[in-house]
UniProtKB/Swiss-Prot annotation:
Binding site for substrate: 89, 139, 143, 261, 293, 345
Predominant subcellular localization, coarse grouping: plastid
Protein name per its UniProtKB record: Ribulose bisphosphate carboxylase large chain
Gene responsible for this protein: rbcL
InterPro entries to which the protein is assigned, alphabetical: RuBisCO (IPR033966), RuBisCo_large_chain_AS (IPR020878), RuBisCO_lsu_C (IPR000685), RuBisCO_lsu_C_sf (IPR036376), RuBisCO_lsu_fd_N (IPR017443), RuBisCO_lsu_N_sf (IPR036422), RuBisCO_lsuI (IPR020888)
Other observations noted: The basic functional RuBisCO is composed of a large chain homodimer in a 'head-to-tail' conformation. In form I RuBisCO this homodimer is arranged in a barrel-like tetramer with the small subunits forming a tetrameric 'cap' on each end of the 'barrel'.
Organism: Ligustrum vulgare (Common privet)
Modified-residue entries (N6-carboxylysine), positions: 167
NCBIfam families, per the entry: PRK04208.1 (NF003252)
Cofactor(s) this protein requires: Mg(2+)
Length: 447
């Protein structure tokens, strides 16, 4: 069975058992009345069952309802169909004040019907020939308004300075100021030039997201013809069907696939309604993507440490044990489906490097947009500062130093022999984003 954990807030006067049963029925075989055609099938075989209900500690009138769905209710290899059933009409149900899908366990038999990420972590490292450290990226800013040639120039400067990747912003598709074909050509030129100068393999996430699936694949084909190693997709705005199609194309044609999660906060930010990001992350691993943005814990965007690490491990590891202290409601076996690299991006700079290296470990991509392009000396020195900071943190960690307590000292030491890093340290020493996360763990959910 596919198991789901829902956070249910019933309307006043509706008992939790009734609310849980209503969720199970409406998201499987039920409708609002008894119909004659019920007698033509075996409802016992196909109906969802609410098998356990527990109150949420510290929250009045909130319950976690566990529902089991028979596997035959779902089309093989279709995240779209899975979500249409589990989070379809039921979210508009009048008997509920609010409803949130907290976690999902897909059985191994169902996981095996998905291709998953086009390549996965190990194959990506082999393609790029980069081992033993996180990968470094940069989102080109300003995100909108640059001409293709100026955009390509910024890409070259960042890659030349020592970054592994640069990135199209999620809103960059094919606008009047920069059509996609021109951008792809100038970025490919920047790639080849920076590779020749540094001797390292470089990549730029060429955003293939488009208004139709056909146009999206056309852009991916052009990227492949240019010899680009990686393309990009906005998987929530583009949709799971489009994403799975692109992931299949990428595997067949040797392209890596970077996934941006634009629109996720609309779905996952409220604690009592929507879908938790850990479910969207699992769905992405099934649908296909080699990288996905996962929050930073320390930057400008939402994300509590334990919750973030919970779904970061869900993306990378082959087997995850149930651990309510990190918000993981079910044990999940990925049966060798390739892993996805989490991408930390959003409001981070060189002073965050020790924390990011410690939190995310080697199998991650650390992306500094403003933290590269905001360097007072320019784009290339900004890239140099980030690369030096990363190498210093990795070396310190390998020597057994504690990045959590000695992080600032490690960065200060490194800045003595890197003027670029020293300048970056001076600019960003005061910037902090200290707000309480909206989506937090429940008080005693460490069962």
């Amino acid at each position: 069975d596919i198991l789901a954990a829902f956070r249910v807030t019933p309307q006043p006067g509706v008992p939790p058992e009734e609310a849980g049963a209503a969720v199970a029925x409406e998201s499987s075989t039920g409708t609002w009345t008894t119909v004659w055609t019920d007698g033509l099938t075996s409802l016992d075989r196909y109906k969802g069952r609410c098998y356990h209900i527990e109150p949420v500690p510290g929250e009045a009138d909130q319950y976690i309802c566990y529902v089991a769905y028979p596997l035959d209710l779902f089309e093989e290899g279709s995240v779209t169909n899975m979500f249409t059933s589990i989070v379809g009409n039921v979210f508009g149900f009048k008997a509920l004040r609010a409803l949130r899908l907290e976690d999902l366990r897909x059985p191994t038999a169902y996981i095996k019907t998905f291709q998953g990420p086009p390549h996965g972590i190990q194959v990506e490292r082999d393609k790029l020939n980069k081992y033993g450290r996180p990968l470094l990226g940069c989102t080109i800013k300003p995100k909108l308004g640059l001409s293709a040639k100026n955009y390509g120039r910024a890409v070259f400067e960042c890659l030349r300075g020592g970054l592994d990747f640069t990135k199209d912003d999620e809103n960059v598709n094919s606008q009047p100021f920069m059509r996609w074909r021109d951008r792809f050509l100038f970025c490919a030129e920047a790639l080849y030039k920076s590779q020749a100068e540094t001797g390292e393999i470089k990549g730029h996430y060429l955003n293939a997201t488009a208004g139709t699936c056909e146009e999206m694949i056309k852009r991916a084909v052009f990227a492949r013809e240019l010899g680009a190693p990686i393309v990009m997709h906005d998987y929530l705005t583009g949709g799971f069907t489009a994403n799975t199609s692109l992931a299949h194309y990428c595997r067949d044609n040797g392209l890596l696939l970077h996934i941006h999660r634009a629109m996720h906060a609309v779905i996952d930010r409220q604690k009592n309604h929507g879908i938790h990001f850990r479910v969207l992350a699992k769905a992405l691993r099934m649908s296909g993507g080699d990288h996905i943005h996962s929050g930073t814990v320390v930057g400008k965007l939402e994300g509590e440490r334990d919750i973030t690490l919970g779904f970061v491990d869900l993306l990378r590891d082959d087997f995850i044990e149930k651990d309510r202290s990190r918000g993981i409601y079910f044990t999940q076996d990925w049966v060798s489906l390739p892993g996805v690299l989490p991408v930390a991006s959003g409001g981070i700079h060189v002073w965050h490097m020790p924390a990011l290296t410690e939190i995310f470990g080697d199998d991650s991509v650390l992306q500094f947009g403003g933290g590269t392009l905001g360097h007072p000396w320019g784009n290339a020195p900004g890239a140099v500062a980030n690369r030096v900071a990363l190498e210093a943190c990795v070396q310190a960690r390998n020597e057994g130093r504690d990045l959590a307590s000695e992080g600032n000292e490690i960065i200060r030491e490194a800045s003595k022999w890197s003027p670029e890093l020293a300048a970056a340290c001076e600019v960003w020493k005061e910037i902090k984003f200290e707000f309480q996360a909206m989506d937090t763990l429940d008080p005693s959910s460490d069962k």
